[in-house]
Amino acid sequence: LALVLDSMRYWVTEMGIDGFRFDLATTLIRDSHHHVDQNHPFKRVIADDPAFDDIKMIAEPWDMGPFGYQVGRFGRGWSEWNDRYRGFMRDYWRGTVGVQELATRLSGSADLFDGSDRPPSASINFITAHDGFTMRDLVSYNHKHNKANGEHNRDGSDDNRSWNCGVEGETDDEGINALRHRQARNLIATLLLPRGGPMITA
């Protein structure tokens, strides 16, 4: 814990960075019995240390352990990846869900983040991330095709909620390519319009 916090202070005070994103952040707040502790010393030190005033703290609020899914529970001072937003928007633009949840997601996902009087910026909205399907994959494939890496297509999630627009993979069909471009624009628009912080991956 001390090494992590000392490293963070160095990056803030010496390098001038303005925020951190914690991969599998729930791992950092487990106690010695591997239980999730939302009042963990790691979070308390960050909240109390003036070096971290006005520094953005962004959690990927889950890990692989028991009760690791902690979306909406990191509390004030933290923003969190909103995978409910990601999943819903992917489903919405595939036409598999209705509009009832759309207003909730576009208005900052208050069902997840309002419990501890958190602002809409607590929701980090995203469609794609550094792992899984890219935006182009989302509109080009119904299934993953990770066959060239020696893992026999076992790696990566099978729950991609994608739509190939009529043809699996690359195509020269102008109509399908036009539809794919429109679908990508739809996804990007719903990433830029809602309350909360957008996360855009290249």
Give residue ranges: language-model regions:
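Active-site mouth loops of central-metabolism enzymes
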Residues: 1-3
